Amino acid sequence: MFDDCLIMAGGSGTRLWPASSSRLPKQFLPAAEKVSFFSMALERALALTGADGRVIIIAGKSHIPHVIADAAKLSAVEKKRLLVIGEPAAKNTAPAIACAVSLSLLRGRERNMLVLTSDHIIKPLKVFKEDAGLAAASAGGGKLAVFGIPPAHPETGYGYIETGNAAGGVYNVSAFHEKPDLQTAKKYAANRHFFWNSGMFAFNAGFMEEQFRLLAPQVYLPFEKLKKPSPEDFPSCRGVKVLSAWRGLEGAYRKTTGISFDYAIVEKCEKTVMIRANFDWIDIGNWEEYVKIRSKGGSEVFSVSAEGCYVDSDIPVALAGVEDLIVIIRSGKNGGPPSALITRRGQTQKVREIVEQIKDRGRKDLL
């Protein structure tokens, strides 16, 4: 279906602090049983690329061990289809996609590419593959396809896509809208022409090169000058190829402009269409939502008259006479400073404010 699939596995992910941090971002946390969000993205990527297809994974250099740990669980045949690239610096999503496009072009301009996020739950896979088929057809027809999610409720944390006419599940895009305030989000959610922007895309490599040159040359041109990687640039780590010494990559990242793919390309492209998602899409954006998919935390808990509490701790915890608490504790024994979060159910969105307070006090080491 797709020749190349890019999984964007960067980002620090502090919405699930302190379990998620710059050292262990959300995508590497367990989403179900012992399977991480990233592992689920790997499964999707492998299912949507052919036997000769390639899965490109771009993550921060410090997160490569987490990528390898999950990828090592795959079969030998599946691992051969992976290529891991460590970003020298965090420059947002446009440079990551530009880097992947430049790499894909080395194999041909007609290669269809799929861009996936690494921290969402998407199911069932069969339905996602059907929707991705529409995206692949649109990409093959010289379009940039973005997956739009029908809003389940008013949401202020996502950008919105406003659509026009539709044909066979493919919608014309009228406009993109920034993350709204609550009143505006309510209006969007009540309007059948508005969808959440999923951050997942499909396009043809040659077409996207043209769009970068036209709309964001300052992002793409530094990657254009990269030479074709040589065999010694691909050392294997536990059976997975890691492009760790691609000559010129660090220089390209120094010269490129840090900007999101949405701002640089998607919102300016005149050939953007939207694929309406028929699959379930869950963005675990706070502890309240995470607790719903995790029956219990990995903790030794002692409790007396404690009801409706969730504990995720690497040290024993005792609860007495409390209810509806979410308790997250990291002792620091597995790396990073000790930290703890205690919040009441229904108040977990305030973790954002806690994170900002930590930054304001100069304690970014906690994040």
Model feature map: region roles:
Residues 1-7, 15-25, 30-117, 123, ...:
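Conserved N-terminal catalytic core of the sugar/cofactor nucleotidyltransferase
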